[in-house]
Amino acid sequence: SKDEAKKDDSKGSVYYLNFKPEVDKQWQKIAKAYTEKTGVEVKVVTAASNQYETTLKSEIAGSNAPTLFQINGPVGYESWKDYCLDLTDTDLYKNLTDQSLAVKGEDGKAYGIPYTVETYGIIYNNAIMEKYFALDGAVVKSMDEINSYDKLKEVVEDMTAKKKDLGIDGVFASTSLKPGEDWRWQTHLANLPIYYEYKDNKVSNMDKIEFKYAENYKNILDLYMDNSVSEKGLLGSVDVATSMAEFALGQCAMVQNGNWAWSQISEVDGNTVKAEDIKFMPIYFGVDDENEGLCTGTENFWCINSQASKEDIQATKDFLTWLTTDSEGKAYMYKSTDDGGLGNAAPFTTFGEDERSSDPLAVEMYKWMESGKTSVSWNFTTFPSQTFKDDFGAALLEYANGNMSFDKVEKQVVDEWASEKG
């Protein structure tokens, strides 16, 4: 029977080193299904959380090295380029919705292909917003009118003044500044000033930055902290989970996070946010508000091991073609994790409207991607290091506690960037 499809060595085999422990079960199921269908062996090994680079280093040096692995972007490519196959002539690259998303070498060729895109912005609970619009004296009557930083600030401050009427403890969820829980500010929010500075200079990386848009960054961070569920002095003990629970329980109207957050929100005990009420708006930054979309990108790029055998390379290409063009393969890609799929928002033209995640924040992401607005690209993969980000986060906590001026925070960011990149 097809359940006993024999392994056929002449067909080559696939070995995928998977980055995401949360979808290991799904990948094992995919591997089995593909082997049963084709007779080609597919092995999936999942690295432990935060151990991917270490695992890849030891595995790639072994006699049975992964034929398929992942990198996080241009920085990861620099470390692994000796093992990245040129994918420019593959269906995988040709079928990308936006080829600028691929990781390219200095030769302009594609070496890393994004298999899912993600986005982040300001998530809001539309039910609370509608309640606000109906109040006497509300400064706007619909979300369409909130289209700039200035307008957002005006609305947020008015909502804070009316929070008793709205039944909320703050407009924004608490700004989690606990060490290790501060990535939304030292990475995601910090991406915006860097994105605009790179854009002004027409580059995708810089050895030294001016932190030209530090003031814009400070403004939005202050807006979050001054209109939040928690007092500034308490933010050092707040983690992301607490912040997301505040949103889920209806204690606030807005929270900065990404499309991956819906599962966190919906799984909170006592969640009050309905799927049809969870929406996205851009993190209006006061630079190019009329054109700014959500922050859309990925840290998930597939690479094929250029040092694998010719047969294994072909088998791996075929496996990826199946995942992105065959109806069965595509179903594994886009179906939600509850439904046995990977829940990927696959950026390929081969996926039809009905082959997209029905997750409400994924639906919002596609809506914004197709709105004609300019997506803010993910440039935080070019930040100097984890230490740089951790130090930035620690400085933000000192700033929140009133122990450090923002000028000092700004100086630290500029100095550490230069010394680490130099």
Show where each model-derived region lies.
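Short, solvent-exposed loop/beta-turn-alpha elements that line the ligand-binding surface or hinge
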Residues: T88-A102, K141-E145, S176-P179, I194-N219, ...
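Extracytoplasmic/periplasmic substrate-recognition and gating elements
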Residues: K37, E41, G62, V229, ...
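Extracytoplasmic "Venus flytrap"/periplasmic binding protein-like
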Residues: A33-Q99, K109-G112, A127-A138, E246, ...
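Short, low-complexity disordered leader/linker segments with a strong preference
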Residues: S1-V14, E36-K37, E41, D91, ...
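Glycine-centered hinge/linker elements that transmit conformational signals in sensory
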Residues: E154-E157, N201-S237
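Hinge/lid segment of periplasmic solute-binding proteins
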Residues: N72-E130, R184, H188, D277-Y284, ...
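Extracytoplasmic/periplasmic solute-binding protein
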Residues: K109-Y115, Y120, D150-M206, C252
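C-terminal capping/gating helix-and-loop segments adjacent to ligand/active sites or protein-protein/ligand interfaces
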Residues: T296, P360-A418
